[in-house]
């Protein structure tokens, strides 16, 4: 009686918002993907995606997230990885790194 409690959570792990720099890296990835016959890569709405470590430095350096494997059940005991996609993703990432360093 005559007591109260309040709890407040602060979201401190933001999704990576779009910047001119990371959109340029995405444009390069898009071209790499098209050149490899894998189709285009479009940005995903930051409000619909999860957070990433790069989110903390995205305002200070150009970067990209979401180059990893494909599967389902992310970050749960039921997580699966589609191993058939790995070679193509590794090749695409390697070509992206090569082109970014030319």
Segments from the language model and where they lie:
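Metal-dependent amide/peptide-bond hydrolase catalytic core
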Residues: 1-102
